[in-house]
Each structure stands twice: as structure tokens, then as C-alpha cells.
């Protein structure tokens, strides 16, 4: 894997043709559109739209389906959902798949401040039917299955949120 600022195309390393591309870059700040959407498009166009590709996985968000949480974040992830279908159509001639895995809450470092705020965490759990968030390992299992084992499902935005979207009133407090 590579860590870099995906907004800077000059930083992209030259690599042999890839078979799997997983777009996992993401932020929740003033750079949401530039990183979450434009950066995802740039990486995908640079590395994934080519004959050797077998699978492209976009890491979307439940917010892309519901519009919940922060406006720029929800809009950036909504754009990823539409772009997933565009890529799926373009790589289908290579017998490749492209899907978006749209997680709800995941126990990551990015979400650590939320998990450590007892009042906020309890309020979120009150709205979460399973009363927990997904582990990183559970997310990795979904990614592996869709990237490696799946050969037919394509162009799909798969909502994996433990039914959080069932509570459409979920908005982060200001």
C-alpha cells in the first residue's frame, strides 16, 4: 500500500498495472471534496481504468446514502457512489468489478474522539440498532470478499451500517 496526498498527482508512484485498487483515503474537514471525491477519481483514473484491473473498491459512507452528518462530507461520499457506477461501466469490458462499500460507524483512529466522548458515544449508541460500531477487522473482511472473491456483483453501493440509516435523523451536533 502507499500513503500520499492523493490531491497531488505528481506524487503518484509509477507502478506496474494493478489488479485491485482500494480507494480508502478519506477525511472529515474542509478538504472533503478535494480528497474524498476528486482524489478518489484521480487515483482511480490513474491506476484502475486499464485492462489488467480485476476489482476496484470505493470506501464510501452511509452518509452518502442518507445525507446525514456534515454537509461537505455527505456530498463528497454521495459523489463517490455515483462515480462507482461510472467506473463499473467502464471496466466491465475487462471482466472487472467496481463496488462501493458504504460503512456506518467503524472503530478507527479517525473516530477515536467520538468514541472517547462518553456523552456523544451514548447518544450515538441510542440511535444505533446493534448498539455497536463495526470493527476494522469486519470492514477488512468485506473489502477482501468484494475485491478478491466477488466476480459478478458490480456497480453497487453496498450499505453496511448495522441499520444506522434506519434512523434518518442522525446528525452530528455542531
Predicted regions and their residues:
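Conserved NAD(P)H cofactor-binding loop of Rossmann-fold oxidoreductase domains
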Residues: 24-28, 163
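Catalytic loop of short-chain dehydrogenase/reductase
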Residues: 55-79, 84-93, 105-106
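Short, small/polar-rich loop/turn modules that mediate ligand/substrate recognition or access, typified
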Residues: 92, 97, 153-156
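Short, flexible catalytic-loop segment of classical short-chain dehydrogenase/reductase
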Residues: 102-113
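Catalytic Tyr-x(3-8)-Lys segment
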Residues: 118-137
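C-terminal substrate-recognition "lid" of short-chain dehydrogenase/reductases
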Residues: 132-160
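Short C-terminal tail/terminal secondary-structure segment
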Residues: 154-174
Amino acid at each position: 500500500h502507499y500513503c500520499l496526498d492523493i490531491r497531488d498527482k505528481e506524487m503518484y508512484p509509477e507502478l506496474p498495472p494493478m489488479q485491485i485498487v482500494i480507494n480508502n483515503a478519506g477525511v472529515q474537514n474542509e478538504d472533503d471534496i478535494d480528497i474524498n471525491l476528486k482524489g478518489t477519481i484521480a487515483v482511480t483514473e490513474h491506476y484502475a481504468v486499464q485492462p489488467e484491473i480485476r476489482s476496484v473498491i470505493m470506501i464510501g459512507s452511509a452518509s452518502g446514502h442518507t445525507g446525514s452528518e456534515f454537509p461537505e462530507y455527505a456530498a463528497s461520499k454521495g459523489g463517490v457512489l455515483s462515480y462507482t457506477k461510472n467506473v463499473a461501466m467502464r471496466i466491465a469490458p475487462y471482466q472487472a468489478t467496481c463496488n462501493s462499500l458504504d460503512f456506518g460507524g467503524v472503530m478507527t483512529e479517525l473516530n477515536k474522539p467520538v468514541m472517547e466522548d462518553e456523552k456523544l458515544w451514548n447518544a450515538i449508541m441510542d440511535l444505533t440498532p446493534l448498539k455497536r460500531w463495526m470493527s476494522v477487522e469486519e470492514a477488512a473482511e468485506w473489502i477482501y470478499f468484494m475485491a478478491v472473491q466477488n466476480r459478478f456483483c458490480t456497480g453497487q453501493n453496498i450499505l453496511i451500517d448495522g441499520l444506522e440509516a434506519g434512523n434518518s435523523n442522525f446528525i452530528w451536533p455542531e
